[in-house]
């Protein structure tokens, strides 16, 4: 169920987007976004674990400790369907590039590939010996990568559901896995304090990113252009790395993250922002370049575990843990 936030329209907001201003391609980057709450999506009965917008921008998928996946309208928050089949809670969900398939990672030690339109399970991926915590499709969507509490990263064939490679990736649970833009590389992160870059084809480790300190790495992903890596560590820090140089370029702080694996994002539809949830129940938005906190979104009543940025519009989805159980959709003019 989506509840809509109604706000009186001010004169200022009416006059902001004149045709001349929106068509002017050389306008300077916005200083700050103005995200406001539009919808609250209720339906999950336990903590929400992950939210992801479909690549075509139409849908939002959510996963939860309640063992369910739910699909919602990306623009209006309207509940579409529930997809069920896992025996235990789900930690992550991800879309195929054509927005037709989902993959989910569960505590039941399996991943499942789902046909979204029918809600049917097409394949169950078995092989991990402990909770599966994270998953993603490659851009071609013929492969899936997964990370588990069994400390391994696995690469799966989508068509057959067979495991193609098992990478002895880490010495602690794997917190995140992500393909780069052409699918040639995988990045993984772990509680062992390491981020590793893998060659998809050979399964070889090409690089290990190590900082002076090595707090658990709770999340990692490639930037949209594939040149950088955004990594979260459980010392209240997000870092932007140039991975080819193995160099940390930017550090983002002020949020709280010491316990949970909280997703972070690049927001590129308007200004260039970094977006993350936080253990103080807020969504934080930083200016990517200046590293300053430009907005904090208030409304959740528990840890904001997951955020997602819409592929084409200035829309953020956020999701929170057990004391909240809701998903919120926020929109901005820039």
Swiss-Prot record:
Job of this protein: Contributes to histone modification. May position the N-terminus of histone H3 for efficient trimethylation at 'Lys-4'. As part of the MLL1/MLL complex it is involved in methylation and dimethylation at 'Lys-4' of histone H3. H3 'Lys-4' methylation represents a specific tag for epigenetic transcriptional activation. As part of the NSL complex it may be involved in acetylation of nucleosomal histone H4 on several lysine residues. May regulate osteoblasts differentiation.
Official protein name in the record: WD repeat-containing protein 5
GO annotations of cellular component type: histone acetyltransferase complex; MLL1 complex
Lineage, broadest ranks: Eukaryota, Metazoa, Chordata, Craniata, Vertebrata
Subunit structure: Interacts with HCFC1. Probable component of complexes involved in histone modification such as the MLL1/MLL complex and the NSL complex.
Region (Disordered): 1-32
Top-rank taxon: Eukaryota
Low complexity: compositionally biased ranges: 13-28
Gene Ontology biological-process annotations: chromatin organization
Any one Pfam family match given in the protein's UniProt record, by short name: Beta-prop_WDR5
Chief location category: nucleus
SMART domains noted in UniProt: WD40
Composition-biased stretches (Basic and acidic residues): 1-12
WD repeat windows: 43-82, 85-126, 128-168, 169-208, 212-253, 256-296, 299-333
